[in-house]
């Protein structure tokens, strides 16, 4: 068949259209933002700022964007994408990828692997969190799986929970998550 226009092409499918003799590609930066939220309420693993910073420092977000998401995403902080000129390029991430920093922060927060299972623990309990996502957008499971893998390298156990999109907002509003990822169009 013929294609006059296609939108929302998944990062993994872009290579299908790489033949410049067959396809004329015009692409712009999306106004879609992926939001990974942390539940910072007392009693939750992310209540301690050092744990939050450790998790963020354990994640190689630049590689996620370049490799997993085929350079179709930009790692960043604000809800405004780089295509909206509000100084995005001047922001500095204080929690860039740094496994040693992540391990040090966890140790400062009292988390150590005392039983040799590969996960840090405190008072006999592993540092464990559930990451809620939905699979309706191709990038969300990829990001969740990469987070699980990178977090394990510093001793944080991340359990992946794929939920129906229709219940995602309710889970977020009720605070029934440790980590939750979704996206919005800005």
Stretches found by the model and what they are:
Residues 1-42, 54, 62, 66-67, ...:
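Extracellular/periplasmic solute-recognition and catalytic clefts
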Residues 3, 22-23, 73, 111, ...:
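Short aromatic/hydrophobic-glycine micro-motifs
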Residues 9-12, 112-185:
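Ligand/substrate-recognition segments at binding pockets and active sites
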Residues 10-13, 47, 51, 60-64, ...:
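Stable alpha-helical elements in mature extracytoplasmic
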Residues 29, 34, 56-90, 139-148, ...:
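Detector for C-terminal structural segments
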Residues 42, 46, 75-114, 135-142:
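Structural transition elements
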């Amino acid at each position: 068949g013929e294609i006059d226009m296609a939108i929302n092409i998944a990062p993994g499918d872009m290579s299908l259209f790489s033949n410049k003799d067959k396809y004329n590609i015009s692409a712009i930066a999306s106004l879609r933002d992926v939001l990974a939220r942390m539940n910072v309420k007392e009693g939750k693993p992310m209540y301690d700022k050092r744990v939050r910073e450790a998790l963020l420092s354990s994640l190689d977000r630049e590689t996620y964007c370049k490799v997993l998401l085929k350079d179709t995403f930009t790692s960043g902080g604000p809800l405004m994408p780089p295509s909206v000129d509000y100084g995005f390029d001047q922001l500095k991430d204080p929690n860039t990828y740094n496994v040693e920093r992540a391990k040090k922060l966890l140790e400062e927060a009292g988390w150590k692997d005392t039983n040799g299972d590969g996960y840090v623990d405190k008072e006999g309990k592993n540092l464990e969190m559930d990451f809620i996502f939905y699979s309706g957008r191709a990038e969300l499971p990829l990001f969740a799986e990469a987070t699980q893998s990178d977090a394990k390298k510093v001793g944080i156990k991340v359990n992946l929970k794929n939920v129906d999109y229709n219940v995602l907002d309710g889970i977020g509003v009720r605070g029934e998550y440790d980590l939750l990822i979704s996206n919005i169009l800005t």
